[in-house]
Curated annotation (Swiss-Prot):
Species name: Rhodobacter capsulatus (strain ATCC BAA-309 / NBRC 16581 / SB1003)
Major localisation: cytoplasm
Assigned EC number: 5.3.1.16
Protein name: 1-(5-phosphoribosyl)-5-[(5-phosphoribosylamino)methylideneamino] imidazole-4-carboxamide isomerase
CDD domains in the cross-refs: HisA (cd04732)
One Gene Ontology biological process: L-tryptophan biosynthetic process
Pathway the protein takes part in: Amino-acid biosynthesis; L-histidine biosynthesis; L-histidine from 5-phospho-alpha-D-ribose 1-diphosphate: step 4/9
Protein's gene: hisA
One term under GO cellular component: cytoplasm
Keyword presence, Amino-acid biosynthesis: yes
HAMAP family: HisA (MF_01014)
Length: 239
């Protein structure tokens, strides 16, 4: 299982939100590129990036910070937040991003996901953000009646590289991930599932790994707070 350290970008800074609320942002650093380089130096195989302003605006906002990160690291990076059209997808992949994450657009325009996944094999992931099993969109501000498993299964034949599943109520709360729901999703689809939201300790990571159906886990606040020792986590996942 791959550990994806998260860099959430707001106004060019590295932050974490609580429950996805922009006014509950804690700034952890003002140099995201340096933070990404630290993650690579620690041995991380990937870096997970989120353009928070972009998720709310519906278009990329923290582009300069993302480009600075891509210039600093050699490991692959994935980015979500405000990527809602083919031109933006093409632009980011041409700039060296390894994978784009499509969230809101996966609900509103699933054909775009299919088109992008076909055009860029292995480089398009679907981000499914949920509250109580229902999908939320537009930076989590809009709730839908779409069920997580239904949305995920609708992309089974689309060729998407991964599904990034975030439990909004766990995100940034340090309460542990929703292992039950994430495992159920992992069993419901053949697409690799990456867990996000609430991963706050080494036991959380081990529990996710031990399901045998979760391909990766994203953690942010726990790493910055020191609750999750990056070196120990990477070593444990290699064991």
């Amino acid at each position: 299982m791959i550990l994806y350290p998260a860099i959430d970008l707001k106004d060019g800074n590295c932050v974490r939100l609580l429950h996805g609320e922009m006014d509950k942002a804690t700034v952890f650093g003002t140099d995201p590129a340096a933070q990404a380089a630290k993650f690579e130096a620690a041995g991380c195989a990937w870096v997970h990036l989120v353009d928070l302003n972009g998720a709310f605006a519906g278009e990329p906002v923290n582009g300069a910070a993302v480009e600075a990160i891509l210039a600093r690291i050699t490991v692959p990076a994935q980015l979500g937040g405000g990527i809602r059209d083919m031109a933006t997808i093409e632009r980011w992949l041409s700039k060296g991003l390894a994978r784009v994450i499509l969230g809101t657009v996966a609900v509103e325009n699933p054909d775009l996901v299919r088109e992008a996944a076909k055009a860029f094999p292995g480089q398009v992931a679907v981000g499914i953000d949920a509250r109580n099993g229902k999908v939320a969109t537009k930076g989590w501000a809009t709730e839908t009646d779409v069920l997580v498993t239904d949305l995920a299964q609708s992309f089974e034949d689309a060729g998407v590289a991964a599904i990034i599943y975030t439990d909004i109520l766990r995100d940034g709360a340090m309460t542990g991930p929703n292992i039950e729901a994430t495992e159920a999703l992992g069993r419901a689809v053949t697409i690799p599932v990456i867990a996000s939201g609430g991963v706050s300790s080494l036991p959380d990571l081990i529990a996710l790994r031990d399901t045998g159906v979760i391909a990766g886990a994203i953690s942010g606040r726990a790493i910055y707070d020191g609750a999750l020792d990056l070196q120990a986590a990477l070593a444990a996942l290699k064991a």
